[in-house]
Amino acid sequence: MAGRWRKLLEQESEHQWLAMCIFCLFAIMGGIAIEGTSTLAGVDLGAGEAAHDGYRVLNIVYFDNGVDIASQLTHTYDPSQGHYLYSQTNTESVNSIYNPSEYDKGDEIRFINEMGDDRAMLSIASTQLVEITLGEQIAYINVNSSDEFWIDDYQENEGPSSAMMVTQESDGTSSIRALSYYVASPPLSNSNLVNWNNIVHLSEDKWVATGTITNTQSSGDSPASPTVRSAIGIIEWQGNLSVAPILTSFLTGDEGQIHNLLSTGNSQVIVAANTGAYQVKDDGSINEIEIPSQSAVTDSQGKTWFIGNQGTNSIATFHNGIIDIEELAKPIPLEIEISEYESGMIFMHGMDGNGAFEMMTLDTTVQDSIEDGRGFLNFAFLTIFSIVLLVMGWTVLDRFRKY
């Protein structure tokens, strides 16, 4: 046995060094090519055949109907005409829900939020919700309450049996009320004088609300121009409609503007602002994340994507406590106003440098797949490397048998 190995190693071949050099060159070129394709793939610009192409999108909800990702409920605005609300189930079907008339009430749409079971909720009248389903069925739901208030935000915990809403009370103050099957609780006591804006479910009986708070007592502040800071609160409600929700934790943040409040689906909530972000956990802790952004979305895996200002060359992600920076092949061409996630796609709506309204999309399913340039090169490199090793091994074994 030892003799065979010695004779084999003593053999000289003019092709051995050539083969080794070619393989080393292939490895180096492959590494350079992989590094060159390290930017995010799946980025595209343009609304395609969507009806909102060229219009400013104020609110939008994307539905996954299993056929066409373009299914959406859209609120657009045209300065020369007014507000429009319509649904689009495919590239050929656009159904109008609201068109501007002499008195345009479209600006009274305070929010449009996606619920479960292909539903969306909005509000345009006091103590009333409007439910719109994917099939364009519209239901006007009156909230059962002896008080009068406007609804600024509405969110559910797996259905209408447990829900929360941000309200503007008749006395002008901002508050939060719980609901169960559209019966409202008394309002939250707002001793901090917070102007609440949004709310989202955290876990069990806990919710996270965000807003702003005006501080006239800060050093250097003038009573005529007080400091406005972001506010984050954890709200608890045990399900008793005769009892108001309770503020159990409160944090005053920076002077930045909160633009997104996102549930990650694992008993955590991400608060995204233009000066940074916060991670709110079920145990009541609120941790700061140093990622400023213009807009943000959370995907189906619980990963949050932070989208920067126009001209930014990267997109930051946060998942399981880890921050990653994903480089873009080109800078972000839009000043993003709103963004949404549905079925692996991130939809970003905003305005370009010429003042035209556009849409940018990012297909998150392409990353590290065979469709991604880097994924393809990785696959090709591993395939060729495996073939070379098999050929070399077969050659060694064949020659070993001959000696």
What are these regions (language model features)?
Residues L58-D78, R110-E114, R119-I124, V130, ...:
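Short beta-strand elements that form the blades of beta-propeller/WD-repeat-like
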Residues T252-T317:
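Membrane-proximal low-complexity regions enriched in glycine and acidic/polar residues
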Residues T76, T212-R229, T365:
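Short, conserved, GDST-rich strand-edge loop motifs in beta-rich repeat architectures
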Residues P333-I384, L397-K402:
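Blade-level signature of beta-propeller repeat domains, shared across WD40, Kelch, NHL, RCC1
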Residues G54-D64, D104-E114, V143-P160, N192-E204, ...:
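Repeated scaffold domains used in trafficking and secretory/extracellular systems
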Residues G36-R56:
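A short helix->beta-strand "capping" segment at the edge of beta-propeller domains
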Residues G82-P100, Q128-N144, V166-S191, T227-I246, ...:
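Surface-exposed loop/turn elements that mediate protein-protein interactions on large endomembrane-trafficking
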Residues M1-A41, I370-Y403:
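Secretory targeting signatures
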